[in-house]
Amino acid sequence: MTFGLLLASGAALADDMPTIKLLMKEGRLHPEMLEVPAMTRFRLEVRNEGPGAAEFESLELKKELVLAPGVTRNLVFFPMKPGTYKFFDDFHPETGQGRIVAK
């Protein structure tokens, strides 16, 4: 019973997280700048609408996510200090540059 309560409380906490959306399409990121609340856990929903694979990667934040065409996946970020954090599409490094700004 305790395990069930832990699962239920974890699901409730996940539902309370803000969700930020990022679209990856044809080597471009939309939007290129994501503003997130500082010191708040959040979910990043990443969707690849391009014809080929895309990869969300941030060396600073130690996050990496490969997406096949048409796939949507989520990453959960722990609270971040105020600042700017770079990320990129590893398959399109020239055009797929973005940043997360925690305020």
What residues fall within each predicted segment?
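Sec-dependent signal peptide recognition
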Residues: 1-3
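N-terminal edge beta-strand
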Residues: 15-41
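Histidine- and aromatic-enriched segments that form or immediately flank copper-ligand environments
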Residues: 49-69, 97-99
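Residue-level recognition of conserved beta-strand positions in structured domain cores
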Residues: 24, 46, 58-60, 77, ...
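Extracellular/periplasmic metallocenter environments
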Residues: 15-21, 67-103
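Beta-strand cores of secreted/periplasmic/IMS beta-sandwich domains, seen most often
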Residues: 32-52, 72-80, 86, 102
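N-terminal post-signal-peptidase region of extra-cytosolic proteins
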Residues: 25-32, 60-61, 70-74
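N-terminal signal peptide c-region/cleavage motif recognized by signal peptidases
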Residues: 9-11
